[in-house]
UniProtKB/Swiss-Prot annotation:
Required for maturation of 30S ribosomal subunits. It comes from the Bacteria. Belongs to the RimP family. Keywords: Cytoplasm, Ribosome biogenesis. GO terms for biological process: ribosomal small subunit assembly; translation. InterPro entries: Ribosome_maturation_RimP (IPR003728), RimP_C (IPR028998), RimP_C_sf (IPR036847), RimP_N (IPR028989), RimP_N_sf (IPR035956). It comes from Syntrophomonas wolfei subsp. wolfei (strain DSM 2245B / Goettingen). This is Ribosome maturation factor RimP. It is found in: Cytoplasm.
C-alpha cells in the first residue's frame, strides 16, 4: 500500500524501519528518486504515507520520511546497477575467508557475486557472504 502511494508520487520506497525507542514507536521511511529527493518531496510522501498507515491502523508515535542519505544501504540489484562505479563499504559474514570489511569501487554483479575493485585488484564477494553494502563517499 505504501509503495503504491509512493509510486503515484514517482518516488521509490528504499526501506522502512519500525523501532521502539524510550517506549515510543518510530516509523522511519526512506525514499528516493533517480535525481534525488528534496524537502518538498519528503513532505508529500509523509502525507501520503500517514494517510496509508492511518487507514490500515498501523500504530506509531512518530513518522519520519527522508532520503536514504549519502551512506545509503544498497539492497536491490537496481541499487547495484545505479551505483556501479561508486565507492562502497561491504561487511561480510564471519565465515567469509577474506576481509570482514571491504572498501572499494563497486564494479558490478552477477547471480552469485558482487565485484569490487580493491586497491587495483578485482575482488568477487559471494552474495551470500555479504551482510550489508553501503555507499562510502569520500570527503
Amino acid at each position: 500500500m505504501v509503495e503504491e502511494r509512493l509510486n503515484e508520487l514517482e518516488l521509490e520506497l528504499v526501506n522502512i524501519e519500525y523501532r521502539k525507542e524510550n517506549k515510543e514507536q518510530f516509523l522511519r521511511v526512506f525514499i528516493d528518486k533517480d535525481n534525488g529527493v528534496d524537502l518538498d518531496m519528503c513532505s508529500q510522501a509523509n502525507r501520503a504515507i500517514k494517510e496509508s498507515f492511518d487507514e490500515q491502523e498501523i500504530p506509531y508515535d512518530y513518522l519520519e520520511v527522508s532520503s536514504p542519505g549519502l551512506d545509503r544501504v544498497l539492497k536491490k540489484e537496481r541499487d547495484w546497477e545505479r551505483f556501479s562505479g561508486y565507492r562502497v563499504r561491504i561487511k561480510t559474514r564471519k565465515s567469509f575467508p577474506g576481509p570482514q570489511r571491504i572498501t572499494g569501487i563497486l564494479l558490478g554483479f552477477d547471480s552469485e557475486n558482487i565485484a569490487v575493485e580493491l586497491e587495483g585488484e578485482l575482488l568477487k564477494v559471494p552474495r551470500e557472504m555479504i551482510t550489508i553494502i553501503r555507499l562510502h563517499p569520500e570527503f
